[in-house]
Amino acid sequence: MAKAKFERTKPHVNIGTIGHIDHGKTTLTAAITKVLHDQNPDINPYTPFEQIDKAPEERARGITISIAHVEYQTEKRHYAHVDCPGHADYIKNMITGAAQMDGAILVVSAADGPMPQTKEHVLLARQVGVPYIVVALNKADVVDDEEILQLVELEVRELLNSYEFPGDDVPVVRVSALKALEGDPKWTQSILDLLKACDDYIPEPVREIDKPFLMPIEDVFTITGRGTVVTGRVERGVVKVGDEVEIVGIHPKTLKTTVTGVEMFRKLLDEGRAGDNIGVLLRGIKREEVERGQVVCKPGSITPHTEFEAQVYVLSKDEGGRHTPFFNNYRPQFYFRTTDVTGVVHLPEGTEMVMPGDNTEMRVELIQPIAMEEGLRFAIREGGRTVGAGRVTKILK
């Protein structure tokens, strides 16, 4: 195969390994880097198992998570790949979105088939919106019986179907991460087949800049003679002078206005783009009509809501979370983007209480509306300290 040269023009995709403990997620991650390194050492460093397994701890929204980041390139793409050593780390990562995934490689041991954590990870992938799954049927070298391999594959497809993934269409690739690490040509090829499945099956993600404009408001002030300016970091999309925008959230009524100026570091610009910290001058808006916690966005692209369902991770005592459980009708602050709003928690039927360190589903009613959509992340706070992290899974009202 001809050597792929490193070009920043390759599309970038975020990916990760998920699945039951000891089914070989970390070994597979190491094998991918080794096979690609052997094929093309100039652009692909080899990351050994030990290095991935001893992933450094990161803090995301006050939660400690061990995540290993590796990167590699196929001919078509540049991948950033995350692997978490511990089961709890996976759950925390998926709920807090410390590392976003455009697709996941579900690792299932061919010798054991789907296990409890396999199910839990697939369910979480569904709830936190991991859009595509590719299956690596690992340890396929130790299963001699073709019928058993077919049975396990069928089981995995049924499991994916039961969580609303297209189980019949998902690529299932038989691999042996260990044999590939040892350099066995048959199993080295299996890793390349798996990567081809990722290249072909996981679509290129829509870049933030191509999405509809949205900027959370951090600050509001008045420029005498010019009007009201709101500042913040553009979350997605592009805003240009002359664009019509809406101001959504907190207040009962959504306001429509026009952008009369965009500035960055006190310089006037034609436009602000995703990632920029900017000030936006708004026509005919009074200082008291807007506040921190609202968003400025493309008209009709997002709506205000007060009631939603969420998947939440509750910080353990060691992470600085609560020392005691909470019960139904718990009333903490929900921190969305730039502001706190009080809300009431309704626990699922049959759940008496939630302990620190648990993950749970809940229904929340906020006392003020927030501009939200499915997938929006938030923190749960008490008196300014974070006690949980969650993600909106369904909007109710």
From Swiss-Prot:
* Record carries keyword Cytoplasm: yes
Q: What is its EC number?
A: 3.6.5.3
Task: Tell me which Pfam families the record gives.
Answer: GTP_EFTU, GTP_EFTU_D2, GTP_EFTU_D3
Cellular component terms per the entry's GO annotation: cytosol
User: Residues annotated as region G2?
Assistant: 62-66
A GO molecular function assigned to this protein is:
translation elongation factor activity
Keyword annotations: Cytoplasm, Elongation factor, GTP-binding, Hydrolase, Magnesium, Metal-binding, Nucleotide-binding, Protein biosynthesis
Q: What positions does the entry give for Mg(2+) binding? A: 26
Ranges for region G3? 83-86
- Sequence ranges assigned to domain tr-type G in this UniProt record: 10-206
Compartments annotated for it: namely: Cytoplasm
Positions in coiled-coil regions: none
Ranges where the record places region G4 = 138-141
The residues that the entry says bind GTP are 19-26, 83-87, 138-141
Q: Where is this region: G5?
A: 176-178
- State if Hydrolase is listed as a keyword: yes
Catalysed conversion reaction: GTP + H2O = GDP + phosphate + H(+)
Q: Tell me the subunit arrangement.
A: Monomer.
- Alphabetical list of PANTHER family matching this protein: ELONGATION FACTOR TU, MITOCHONDRIAL (PTHR43721:SF22), ELONGATION FACTOR TU-RELATED (PTHR43721)
Q: Which family does it belong to?
A: Belongs to the TRAFAC class translation factor GTPase superfamily. Classic translation factor GTPase family. EF-Tu/EF-1A subfamily.
Task: Write out the function statement from the record.
Answer: GTP hydrolase that promotes the GTP-dependent binding of aminoacyl-tRNA to the A-site of ribosomes during protein biosynthesis.
List the protein's name.
Elongation factor Tu
Source species of the chain: Acidothermus cellulolyticus (strain ATCC 43068 / DSM 8971 / 11B)
